[in-house]
Amino acid sequence: MRGLVNKLVSRSLSISGKWQNQQLRRLNIHEYQGAELMGKYGVNVPKGVAASSLEEVKKAIQDVFPNESELVVKSQILAGGRGLGTFKSGLKGGVHIVKRDEAEEIAGKMLGQVLVTKQTGPQGKVVSKVYLCEKLSLVNEMYFSIILDRKSAGPLIIACKKGGTSIEDLAEKFPDMIIKVPIDVFAGITDEDAAKVVDGLAPKAADRKDSIEQVKKLYELFRKTDCTMLEINPLAETSTNQLVAADAKLNFDDNAAFRQKEVFAMRDPTQEDPREVAAAKVDLNYIGLDGEIGCMVNGAGLAMATMDIIKLHGGTPANFLDVGGNASEHQVVEAFKILTSDDKVKAILVNIFGGIMKCDVIASGIVNAAKEVALKVPVVVRLEGTNVEQGKRILKESGMKLITADDLDDAAEKAVKALAH
């Protein structure tokens, strides 16, 4: 789903695609949590309940869905593509529509199992909860999202007359179906703004006035909870003439954690990369990748340039790691611990251009890290800038077997060569 958003706004982003997403840590919550939150803001959502055990599943079926003939059982992981995913146990699909008396059985096949989707990577994610929902009778499926758009310097509503799993393809084949409505961040959403969205979607059955109110409520949720992205796919029309958020994905700005206590209490660290969780605890910007060369760099731009040059020389970066401009020795030590905890890392490249960040602090951190962590892989170090001579002296006097480099190109080349030794 997120692919469409990236494609539609790529012109307004200085960095598009995957790397853009890596510059901000964003809270991602489960579908059932998003539905609960939307319900509090008056957004129409399907009746549903989350369960983490077969006992809870059985109770929910009896208490919440006593008269339903069919239910939707949805695995809850923080990744897209669940419907087309495969469990390592062999079960196909992380979303199933089943008869009421089959719901407990299918939930049992999901709970505690690892689901692999196009977004999880081959390792997959463990399903700790399932979401039981009423099966809606849908007459139309559409797409709706709100994002933060740099070009318009504010929220942007993106909608499409057609929804579902093929939204990216539809955006390419039928660009005239895409509706984009920028919202004035100071004035907020107006009736006219909401009407543009609804008239563009042209609902077949849902009441126009009610639909306008639903769009306004979705925007209020986006604004009041510090969302960075709200995506509903599908935004569905039911046989009862209602507009319903049938499936939603919400991300929130981590910088708002101090004032969004209720929202951030929903965080599920068990679904996050443990390395990213550890990095966040010490204020490091870290994103795990699948390569072999661990990177520690100061500055997001330099970090991305470092990864690009590693690729240019035939290597693959194992991570994005920006220690920032004011890192302490402790943070450098913790950064090394995170890098060395990745079994795929066969070499480490430290690339520091000291401005506010001092090279001697980095050097001391490297030496202290070596005392706490058994460095079993070659380490390539390129230092330049503030206190560079002090930094080089600290490294030399440490007696560590380091590979030094004169510039970034040299450092990347040496890191790639070090993989062969």
Curated annotation (Swiss-Prot):
Binding site for substrate: 298, 355-357
Top-level enzyme category: ligase
Signal peptide: none
Gene Ontology MF: a single term: magnesium ion binding
Catalytic activity: succinate + ATP + CoA = succinyl-CoA + ADP + phosphate
Binding site for Mg(2+): 233, 247
ATP-grasp domain sequence ranges: 35-278
Alphabetic keyword roster: ATP-binding, Ligase, Magnesium, Metal-binding, Mitochondrion, Nucleotide-binding, Transit peptide, Tricarboxylic acid cycle
Residues annotated for ATP binding in this entry: 74, 81-83, 141
Swiss-Prot/TrEMBL cofactor(s): Mg(2+)
Cofactor annotation comment: Binds 1 Mg(2+) ion per subunit.
Entries under InterPro entries matching the protein: ATP-grasp (IPR011761), ATP-grasp_succ-CoA_synth-type (IPR013650), ATP_grasp_subdomain_1 (IPR013815), Succ-CoA_synthase_bsu_CS (IPR017866), SUCC_ACL_C (IPR005811), Succ_CoA_ligase-like_bsu (IPR005809), Succinyl-CoA_synth-like (IPR016102)
Associated pathway: Carbohydrate metabolism; tricarboxylic acid cycle; succinate from succinyl-CoA (ligase route): step 1/1
EC nos: 6.2.1.5
Keyword Metal-binding appears in the UniProt entry: yes
Record-linked SUPFAM superfamilies: Glutathione synthetase ATP-binding domain-like, Succinyl-CoA synthetase domains
PROSITE patterns listed in its UniProt record: ATP_GRASP (PS50975), SUCCINYL_COA_LIG_3 (PS01217)
Transit peptide, UniProt annotation: 1-26
Top-rank taxon, per record: Eukaryota
Subunit structure: Heterodimer of an alpha and a beta subunit.
Stated family: Belongs to the succinate/malate CoA ligase beta subunit family.
Protein name according to UniProt: Succinate--CoA ligase [ADP-forming] subunit beta, mitochondrial
Species this protein is from: Arabidopsis thaliana (Mouse-ear cress)
